[in-house]
A protein has these predicted regions:
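A detector for short, charged/polar N-terminal pre-domain segments
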Residues: 1-6
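Short basic helix-loop element that most often maps to the first helix and adjoining turn
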Residues: 9-24, 28
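Residue-level detection of the helix-turn-helix DNA-binding "recognition helix"
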Residues: 16, 30, 37, 41-42
């Protein structure tokens, strides 16, 4: 089974280490900031 919470924590750690806001990361990967939020919280899987 996929560990969505673990993946979300790694995404957030990488984002903050690169000093990116959710908004900026969302712009870079062409998704909404809310989608980034849901990934970081383990609520959604990346596709």
């Amino acid at each position: 089974m996929i560990d969505l919470i673990g993946i979300g924590k790694r995404v957030k750690t990488a984002r903050t280490e690169h000093k990116l806001t959710r908004e900026k990361l969302a712009e870079i990967v062409n998704v909404t900031p809310h989608y980034i939020y849901e990934i970081e919280r383990g609520m959604k899987a990346m596709s």
